[in-house]
Amino acid sequence: GPVIDQCFNPTTRRLQKSRVPIIAAVNGVAAGAGASIVMACDIAIAAPNASFIQAFSKIGLIPDAGGSWLLVERLGLARAMALAMTGDKLSAAQAKEWGMIWDVAEDCVAAAVAMAERLAVMPTRALTATRHLMRDAGSRTLDQQLDVERDTQSALGRTHDYFEGVKAFLDKRSPQFKGE
């Protein structure tokens, strides 16, 4: 009830609706809502000792914080169903192999910071648009997605960052994006 409505669900919704990419670093066990919140992030990097578990079935509950939707979205129905029903633990290596997380790194925090620094110098409007296109793709048909891609590409093709990216490529130098 109240904890789900006041804490977990608003957190998952905020992560899903964010304008900027969300990066998670996981060191240890991400259980229940913790695992769901990791899956709500755009990029997750885990330490080798990290694991993910949805053990709700072992105590007579169901996945929360979006877990029932996020597991299916990330892993597919068969894997999501088995994990939710058995409460089995998923290792970091298996989570990477199955597509739950992006990578496994000895120092997951340093790797997450490095990823954030890498994204910070990229064309932020394009990253935001890519994030929204990917997040919303499942609710559209292919024809609808093609139209949204066309419209988004057209808008981004008139930005400073696009012109800077093309010029930098032609000049054989690194681009200096401004988010404009």
Per-segment meaning from a language model:
Residues 1-26, 74, 157:
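An acidic, glycine-rich surface segment that forms the CoA-thioester-binding/catalytic face
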Residues 5, 9, 32, 62-65, ...:
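Glycine-rich phosphate-binding loop at the start of an alpha helix
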Residues 16-24, 39, 49-100, 116-119:
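Conserved catalytic cores of soluble enzyme domains
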Residues 24, 28-34:
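Gly/Ser-rich catalytic serine loop of serine hydrolases
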Residues 32-33, 50-55, 108:
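Short glycine/proline-centered loop/turn elements that form peptide/ligand docking sites
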Residues 33, 39-40:
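Left-handed beta-helix
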Residues 37-38, 95, 112, 169:
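Hydrophobic/aromatic residues within transmembrane alpha-helices
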Residues 45-50, 96-147, 154-160, 176-180:
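C-terminal long alpha-helix characteristic of the crotonase
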